Structures are given as C-alpha cells and as structure tokens.
Amino acid sequence: MKRFLSIALMATSLAIITACTKDDSPNGNANLEHFTYTIQSNQWYTRGVYGSLGWQYYSQIDIPDITKDVMENGAVMIYIKQNDLFYPLPAITDEDGWVNTVQFNVYLGQVEIFVEDTDFQTVAPGAMTLKIVIFNKLKSLPAYLDIKDYKQVLSYTNK
C-alpha cells in the first residue's frame, strides 16, 4: 500500500503544473481562498533518526495569506490529490499493520506537510499535489458546509 500510494502520487502529480496557483475568480466567496500546490520530489527534507520514532519527511510552503487574523478567526484545510480526487488531511493508510500518515501544521505565513510511517522507515513521498483552502472567518460560514468535503468547499467558494 505504501508503494501504491507513492506511485499513485508521483504518477498523478507528473501531469500537474508545479507552480502554486491562486484560484482567484471575481465571483468567488470573499471568506475563502484556495490554492493548488505541488510539492516536487526534491522539496522533501528529513527530520529525526532513520528507523526511530519521529523519523519523517516534511516540506514547507510559504503562504503569505495565512495572516494573524486567519490564525485567530479562520482556519486552513489541506486536501491531498489521490486518483483524481481530493481527500482531507490528515490522510491515513494502513498496509500490513503499518500505518502511513500525511499531516500538516499551520504557521503564520506557512504550512508544513509531513509524512511518517509507524514502522519508522518512511519512504520518500515523491511529488504530491495539494489543495490549500484558507477560511478567513469561520463564524461567517454556513452550518451545512462540511469543510472536510473539498467538492462542497469548492462549490461554496464559487457562489
């Protein structure tokens, strides 16, 4: 499963433009911003001691639109592209009793994506395509909106 996930991510990402692009339509919702970003295979770094707890691959993406106001009143959701669909992070897969996770941290002006396995032998992720959604004001979102469902978020963004 780890190998399948890595291969699927690499194959899918080869067809994607590698630049971070802001989806900025004039009809979009002012409370949401969304970006497509592809982390290239050479943009992954390692942290920790191989074979030990905490060994992981990570990549950092600068996003100036993650402001103090977003940190205090909004939210950031990230979706990973797998097999032409987007799934919310954290993404967890299980193979032969070992668990692979793709997670993220949000900082002022930046997000960090990290990948690790419970067997402490994480394989380099390769290229990974993400959708990053910034909710500027959570209180202004409708109750029916499931922010874990990228299609709902995209539909709401384009209202």
Segments from the language model and where they lie:
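Bacterial Sec-dependent N-terminal signal peptides
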Residues: 2-5, 15-39
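First exposed extracellular module after export/assembly in secreted or surface-exposed proteins
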Residues: 28-159
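Repetitive helical segments and hydrophobic/amphipathic motifs
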Residues: 11-12
